[in-house]
């Protein structure tokens, strides 16, 4: 894997961040970018970068509600309303398999999310390839070399 491929998931996940936060993410050192698991944006606090075993505060400005909405707009390609169906589970999946977890208030009608209310935080979970973890499970989903009906 070359240098560019190593940081591709990190860059993809950071691509939905507002400019000041993306610059802060890009300013992280190489070991931090390699170990990063998520970006956390909490209303009123600087963005943090979560590594495998620690959380680092970035040099970003404090997060505003407008910043949180910008992330959703970037993730939904300019229309937060287009993600309503996808957000029912509490997260939105973006290009590259990265997930944005949401925390805040929504407007409900008959048990269905109708609109976003106030957002208080979000986490952008960086998807990473983990090789070899499915080896043992493979024998359980194959029947005479054919893949059984499987939900992963």
Q: What spans do the regions from the language model cover?
A:
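P-loop NTP-binding catalytic core
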Residues: 80-146
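N-terminal accessory targeting/assembly segments
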Residues: 1-97
């Amino acid at each position: 894997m070359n240098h560019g491929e190593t940081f591709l998931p990190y860059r993809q996940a950071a691509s939905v961040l507002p400019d000041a936060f993306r610059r802060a993410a890009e300013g992280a050192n190489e070991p931090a970018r390699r170990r990063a698991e998520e970006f956390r944006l909490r209303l009123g606090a600087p963005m943090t970068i979560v590594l495998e075993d620690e959380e680092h505060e970035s040099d970003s400005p404090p997060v505003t509600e407008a910043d949180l909405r910008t992330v959703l707009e970037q993730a939904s390609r300019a229309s937060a309303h287009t993600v309503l169906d996808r957000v029912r589970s509490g997260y939105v999946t973006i290009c590259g398999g990265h997930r944005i977890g949401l925390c805040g208030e929504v407007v409900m009608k008959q048990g269905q999310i109708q609109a976003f209310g106030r957002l208080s935080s979000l986490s952008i979970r960086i998807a990473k390839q983990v090789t070899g973890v499915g080896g043992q499970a493979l024998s359980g989903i194959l029947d005479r070399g054919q893949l059984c009906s499987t939900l992963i």
